[in-house]
Amino acid sequence: MPFCSYQEGLKVASDLGNKAIQTEASLSSLSPVASPIPTLQKAFPIYISAAEAYGHLLSSKLVPQSDIETVKRKWRLVLERAEKVKSRIEQLGGHVAKAEIGDRGEEIAVLRRASLINGVAVELWRPPGDTFDAGEPYREAVQPELAAAQLDMDPEWRDIQADCWLHQAPNEGDWVMRQGPVSDCSVVAAMGVGIKHAGQFGTAFGWENLYPQDAHGRPRRSKNGKHILKLLLNGAWRSVVLDSLLPFSKRDKTPLFTTCHPAPHILPTSVGSPWAPLALKGYFKVHGGYSLRGSNPSSDIYEFMGWIPERIGLKEGFQREKEWKRMKEAWHKGNVMVSLGTGSKVSEGLVKLHAYGVIRLREEGHERILDIFDPGATSFTMSWDQVCAEFEALHLNWKPSVMPNTATRHWSWPKPPDLPSDADPGMMNTRYRLHVNASSPSSSLSEVWILLSQHITSRDRPLDDIALHVFEGLGPNNSRNLGAIYSEGLERTNPYTNSNHLLVRYQLRRPTSDLTLIPSRDRGIDQTGFTLNAFAPASISLSLERISRTLPFTQRISGNLTDRSAGGHPGWPTHMTNPQYKVVVRPGEGKSEISGRIILHGEKDVPWNVKLIWGRGQLVYELSEDLIVADTGSYSYGIAYCDIPELQPDTYTLIVSAFEPGQTGLFSLSLEATAPVSIIPIAAEGAGMYNRVVNGFWTERTAGGRPSGGTYESNPRVEMVLSKPATIQSRLYLPTRSPVPINLTIFKRAQGGALGEQLVTTGPYSDSICGVSTGKMKLDSGVYLLVPSSYEKSKGGWVLKIWSDVALSAEIVG
């Protein structure tokens, strides 16, 4: 919304604001029996339009300095009014329009609420004017909280000597960081990495963020002691205002802050280049003080430079050869910064839970070497193999030009008490659709990166456990799964992390794709703002939009994977024991096509999957590809999701499963559609009956094989005793998947324990993964022998389940 002049922009914004007020004021003329919702729904988007107009005006350079606060106040007023109108609509049972303008208005509100961190106001970034450091000396009433080590040194706050500004930013030569008595090693490691990178590749770390600046864009001494630091905080570049006072020891004048010196530095009392301690003061101010224990260097580099952060665990599932190659190639182009983190257990010479910076990496013959910087000590070298063994995490920051195309969205998660009493918190997860289009389909498919960031408000409030789930539709050419999500086993690691940034690198499978992005959080107890950034190479275009939380018809059901029902993935013989549901899709209005959506939210440590099957609402014992209508794809921790573009009116069976047998947990399942749907549980096999489970083993002596083999009577026998007539059913299966054909036959017990009359058999020997079943049958009271056998005298374990509508006993007798 570009404006030619300040007056034009102010008039547009004011007119929209007045129109919104007049629309809302018309409520007073409504009949007492008329609903206020339609009028409020008209007023809401007009308020948002007014807020957008004020926002565009503020982001321009048209507003005179003297009017900025007035325009900001009007902007806040219309936003606050919009929030109140939206809240009123929802209280009355209505919904605000799902138009893009509403999303934009909500995003503006999210960024505005994120402007207070640890009690420090951090307004959205605007380049400061040339005279902001003129006038009376600027001194803040409260200085950042000091760390215990600083307090022990009898601190005082005083200004930097003017001649210190002769030591300018480290753009050439060798500069070193000295941490000093500061608790946070991560930001010092980040700054050390940035300075070394600047010396090698000419990047500008930190000093371009500090104002005022001279004609060359370098920080200079403030005339009145007021500085402004530019940091990327809570989804946007923001201003941190600070004064020029720094802590020194009264005893010996030693600086009680991190310093940056030409190597080697001369005296312990030397301040070095003043931009570094001042930039760090601004950082510590907004993060709660010098006593901050630290996070990780990649988050700090992201705040100062906007380089994309990535954390890679060096233990489970780490591919060291692949990562070295990727990292080394980017390093030599100046496209990556590297840092490291230790865990709670370290070898001698390393500090636990400590951050280290990598200032150089190289190959010497067959050796791969890293030069590592310790903020609290000195530098040392390690081989790549040593690093992978000794450190817990690899932190990378990627130059934004590597992924120049971006799309960004902001939103807020409500705190649980704000949800309706019958709401499932998982269903409140905001969903986005990322449309990806490669300009040259013939080229090799690239990755897209998606960064989930949670906004911080206080150092005393713990971060949420967050995850980002990415699902890709297979597209119209995959007729088997009707556009269901691509399936490929199990997620490599649990995606939940207790961090403020989480990067997912997603390998595209087609030039044009629609990715469904579902951020989720676990145990979140507060309203929290979040930002979602998508990144792609120059050859790929992106669009990111929020999608509706629900389709018109929704059915929800809660369930539980228990020790008895958790059967694992379809490769396990026990998959049939998983919870199954009858799903009925009824015809919609007219001849319109029906689409659907499956969403499951479960415990975050369990990998989940849901399949919709042509099962006619009956139990499905074994899956085949032609039965699958829709599939949520790879087993994913905490969530399962898929869109179903085409859904026929019919009766289906739906199966919920975890990856491994015995993985238990509660879940909430939602089935949405554009036509009426219903979902009800299907009773498990043998439900409501007495049950006995017999575990046995075919040994060299007892593997008798099939009847025609001559040794059939050597097979194990399970004696079943019925005290009165009963209906029974039984199933024999192998505990692990195996191509061994098996059979179960039931005999009357003859005199002396011999096999008597054959009553029922499961038929031809079968290697079906779910085993073989006798089905339901009626038997008189008496003693019976059940004989499990394999076709080829195979040795190994077997499991026999027997159900009866009367009490029974069953045990191996031979």
From Swiss-Prot:
GO terms for molecular function: calcium-dependent cysteine-type endopeptidase activity; cysteine-type endopeptidase activity. Pfam families: Peptidase_C2. PROSITE patterns: CALPAIN_CAT. The keyword rRNA-binding does not apply. Its EC number is 3.4.22.-. Keywords: Hydrolase, Protease, Thiol protease. The keyword Manganese does not apply. GO terms for biological process: proteolysis. The active site is at 185, 354. SMART domains: calpain_III, CysPc. Residues 118-400 form the Calpain catalytic domain. Belongs to the peptidase C2 family. PalB/RIM13 subfamily. Required for the proteolytic cleavage of the transcription factor RIM101 in response to alkaline ambient pH. This is Calpain-like protease palB/RIM13. The gene is RIM13.
